[in-house]
């Protein structure tokens, strides 16, 4: 479903930006080429008419249907705030993976930005739409200076990615970010299985208990953020810590005994606000890996507050390291250790995780 509209000021927004996003440049009527790096270099592209072409990818089923209702309320604000500067296309997803296809088509058609409207799941699909067969999707005209930015209006069950940037779940603020038109370059993670089945993530990927909990949580999204608690309780039933083999940056294999969960963060939060990879910065060219070992159910109960406020790195049996790539295998080869990224179930180990520095520009 496609609705095209032209969509001026609503509510002033002056929130402080994270330090890793300070190198920015406003979108103007000029065209710029990007200058590489993962540190937040900024640039801008608009259509030949001088108006920005924005594609909003909306998941109407998000948050048990709440996304569709909130989006309908937001549309008048979009038209009011953005009318002088942009052309807006609204595209509603019809099912799983549809946002990926919509995004690829929009980029090939030369959109200046694709904005995910929904939760982390919708954002995850839109990010994957920026890539095809291991390469960035390009504008079909071959125009080297043309680059599509990623945007976000958080209206879903979970908005963990937005937390890293200090963004509230306020659609008015999101519209103001889009109106300002500032771009910053950020990293993206990519996951593969023996060189195949490439999958991209922008927030956090994880292995074993947390991934299993996320798998179960997805079945209870009608309960809102409570779904994460229900998923964790269900995942604990029959859970066993596992010995794993890990290789960092192509080096020697290391044995990690009794792994409870392994998390690979491009950003900081997952699971409805848990600051699991607190040192992750999505523009520094690295991923943060946090490993929890030999945790029992009561460890989570006693240390849950530390996991949420990001102080768990000082806890025994918790380690953290910065990597460009990490390969993870289970030693027993049971084929039953869950893998997920940005809350989406990807299957089971083995997997390789690596960073793509400065892979996407985000409206910030």
From Swiss-Prot:
Where is this protein found?
Answer: Mitochondrion
Q: So which residues are the signal peptide here? A: none
GO molecular function terms here?
A: ATP binding; D-erythro-sphingosine kinase activity
- Extract the SMART domains matched here: DAGKc (SM00046)
Active site at which residues? 120
The residue ranges of the DAGKc domain are 49-195
Its domain of life reads Eukaryota
Instruction: Give any Pfam family that matches.
Output: YegS_C
One annotated GO biological process = phytosphingosine metabolic process
InterPro entries, per database record: ATP-NAD_kinase_N (IPR017438), Diacylglycerol/lipid_kinase (IPR005218), Diacylglycerol_kinase_cat_dom (IPR001206), Lipid_Phosphate_FormReg (IPR050187), NAD/diacylglycerol_kinase_sf (IPR016064), YegS/DAGK_C (IPR045540)
Task: List residues binding substrate.
Answer: 118-121
The EC code for this enzyme is 2.7.-.-
Q: Which GO terms describe its cellular component?
A: membrane; mitochondrion
Question: What is this protein for, i.e. what is its function?
Answer: Involved in the production of sphingoid long-chain base (LCB). Is required for the cold-induced accumulation of phytosphingosine-phosphate, the regulation of the cold-responsive MPK6 and reduction of root growth at moderate low temperature.
Protein known as: Sphingoid long-chain bases kinase 2, mitochondrial
Primary gene name:
LCKB2
């Amino acid at each position: 479903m496609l609705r095209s509209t032209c969509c001026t000021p609503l509510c002033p927004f002056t929130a402080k930006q994270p330090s890793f996003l300070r190198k920015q440049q406003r979108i103007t009527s000029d065209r710029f080429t990007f200058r590489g790096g993962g540190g937040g270099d900024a640039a801008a592209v608009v259509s030949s008419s001088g108006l920005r072409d924005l594609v909003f990818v909306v998941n109407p089923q998000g948050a048990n249907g709440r996304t569709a209702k909130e989006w309908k309320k937001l549309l008048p604000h979009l038209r009011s705030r953005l009318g002088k500067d942009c052309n807006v296309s609204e595209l509603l997803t019809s099912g799983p993976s549809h946002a990926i296809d919509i995004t690829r088509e929009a980029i090939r058609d030369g959109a200046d930005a694709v904005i995910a409207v929904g939760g982390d799941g919708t954002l995850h699909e839109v990010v994957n739409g920026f890539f095809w067969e291991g390469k960035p999707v390009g504008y079909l005209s071959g125009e080297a200076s043309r680059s599509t930015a990623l945007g976000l209006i958080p209206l879903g069950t979970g908005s963990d990615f937005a937390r890293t940037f200090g963004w509230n779940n306020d659609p008015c603020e999101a519209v103001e970010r889009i109106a300002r038109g500032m771009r910053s370059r950020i990293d993206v993670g990519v996951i593969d299985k023996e060189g195949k089945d490439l999958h991209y993530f922008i927030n956090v990927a994880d292995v074993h208990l947390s991934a299993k909990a996320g798998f179960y949580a997805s079945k209870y999204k009608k309960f809102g953020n409570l779904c994460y608690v229900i998923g964790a309780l269900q995942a604990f039933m029959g859970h066993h810590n596992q010995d794993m083999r890990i290789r960092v940056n192509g080096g020697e294999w290391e044995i990690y005994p009794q792994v409870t969960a392994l998390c690979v963060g491009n950003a900081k939060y997952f699971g409805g606000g848990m600051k699991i990879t607190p040192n992750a910065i999505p523009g520094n060219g690295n991923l943060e890996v946090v490993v929890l070992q030999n945790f029992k159910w009561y460890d989570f109960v006693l240390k849950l507050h530390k996991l949420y406020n990001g102080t768990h790195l000082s806890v025994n049996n918790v380690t953290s390291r910065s990597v460009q790539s990490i390969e993870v295998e289970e030693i027993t080869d049971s084929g039953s250790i869950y893998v997920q990224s940005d809350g989406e179930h990807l299957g089971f180990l083995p997997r390789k995780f690596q960073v793509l520095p400065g892979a996407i520009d985000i409206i910030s």
